[in-house]
Amino acid sequence: MTDSPRPVSRRTFLHRSTGAGAALLAGGVLAGGTAAAAPPARRLAPAGIAPADLDPLALLKKMLAFDTQNHGEGGVTRPHAEMLKAVWDSAGVSSEIIPTPKKDNVHLIARIEGTTSAAPLLLLGHSDVVPVERAKWSVDPFGGVVRDGEIYGRGALDMKGANAAFVAGLLRHLNEGGRFDRDIIVLTDCDEEAGPHGSRWLAEHHWDKIDAGMVLTEGGWFLAQKDRTTPMLITVTRQDKVYFNLDIVADGTATHSSKPNPDSAIARLSRAVTAIDTWLAPVTLTPVTREYFSALAEATEDAPFKRALELMLAARSQPARERAAALVVKRSSYPWLHRALLRTTHAFVIEDAGYKENVIPSTATLRLNCRGVPGGQRPRDFLAGIRERLEGRDVTVKLVGNAGESEEDALKRLDETFSRPPSSIDSPLYTAIGDAAAKTYPGAVFAPALFEAGTSLYPWTSKGIPGYGVYPYVLDNDQLIGMHGNDERIAVAALKQGTDFMYRLFDRFRVR
C-alpha cells in the first residue's frame, strides 16, 4: 500500500541499550480531532457477505444478544457459534463446530485458506463471558444498547468487541476478493473464563485443527491521554501474569447463635483480611515492564506523571523504587492497571462462611486470586510473605492446586510458568501489529507489554509458538475498569477505528 511506512524492526521499538523505548508515530487523535483516514475500499471480487457483517457495531450487537455467561463450569455457546458459523458460510469460509462433553458448550473453528504452506496465523477469541449482576446494570446487558456514543453489554470489552473487530476486519478483505499468504484460523473458544473444556482441552483433542505459527488474542490496552480521547499508548502484550489462588481458612467452635463465642471463625477471618487489606507486595520491574513504563513515559503529555515514571525507572534502591511507584499510581489516569503491572497482586474474590442463621459456623474461608509478574517475585515467595504477614492470627494459608497435587508440586508448576520467556518480538505478526498501529493511531507510541490478566494462549506458548494480545479499541479508565464489572462498554468510534487497525494488520498477510 502506498501509505505504508518503512518496515518496523526490533531496533525501532528497542532503541535504547536497556531495551526501553517505543516507536513514536506522527500526529492525530481518536475523537475531537483528526484520526487517521480509514483504508480505501478495494472491491475486487465481492463475496456473498451481508453488509451488516462488515460493520463491527452491527456484528457486535449480534454477538452480545447471546447470553454466554460462564458461572464456572462453562456456558451455553452453541447458539452464538451457530450464528457466527452462518457469517463464515456466507463468506465462503469453511468452519466447524467442535462439541465439548458439556451440552451446548462448543468451540468454533473457521479456516481461511491461504496461497502457501506458511505456518498459519491463528486468531483466538473467547465467546463465553463472566456472569452479570442484572440489578446493577443501567441497561439490558444482552441488549447491545448504544448510549452517548458507547455500546453496552456483557462482553463488549472482554472480548466480543475484539472478536467483532477481528471478524469484520477479515471480512472486509474477503469482500474485496483478497487472499492471504497463509491460512488464517479463527478460533472462537469456550471456557476461557472458567471450566474444563477450554483451549487446553481443545489442544489435547484437536491440535491438528489449531496448530499455527503465531497467535493473536486479547491483551494489550490502547490507552488515551489525560483528555480521555487522544490515543497515547498502543500496546501488544507478549506475556501474561502468573495466575494462582490462595485460601485463607479460619477455624472456630460451632455452636448455637444465641451464645456468641470468642473464637468465632468468621471474626478470625475478618481480622486476617484486615491485616492484608492494604498491604502491597514489593514492586518488581522486569525487562518487559521496564519497556512498557519507558514507553509510557515517552507517550504521556502529563509532565508530573512523566517525572514519576522517570524516577521509578531510575531508582537504585527498593525504598526509592517503592516511593516512586506509589507516585506513578497516584498520578496515573489508569491507576488500577498500573498498580497491577508493578507487583504480584491479591484480590479478595470469594468468601465462604456459615450455612444457617442460628448456627455459628466452625470454618470460614476466603479465596485470594493472585497474579504474579513473570521474572519478578516468585509465587512461592509471595505465599511465604502472606503466611508471615498472617502469623499468629489463627488462620491457615493454603495454595490451591490441581486435584491430587501437593503444594510443592503446585509451586514447581508455577515456577515453570513464571520462568517461561515472553513471546519474541521478531515475528511477522508482531511487525504487522506495529505497522497497523503506525497507520491507524498516528501520534501514539507503540510498545510491547505485560498483560495483567490471563488468556487462553498456553497450548501455543508452551510449545514456543509466539502469542500476543490486543484489545483493539482506545479506552478511558472508566471503560477499562468496566471489564468484568457493571455497565461494561466501549466507544463505538473506538471500535470502528480498531476494526481499521485490524484490517491494516491483516493487510500485511494479503497477497498482491
Annotate the PLM regions.
Residues 38-42, 51, 221-497, 503, ...:
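Metal-dependent amide/peptide-bond hydrolase catalytic core
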Residues 40-134, 363, 367, 379-383, ...:
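N-terminal helical capping/dimerization or prosegment-like subdomains
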Residues 61-69, 89, 93, 171-175, ...:
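Sec-exported extracytoplasmic/periplasmic mature domains
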Residues 188-214, 218-235, 241:
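Hydrophobic, small-residue-rich alpha-helical packing segments that form membrane-like cores
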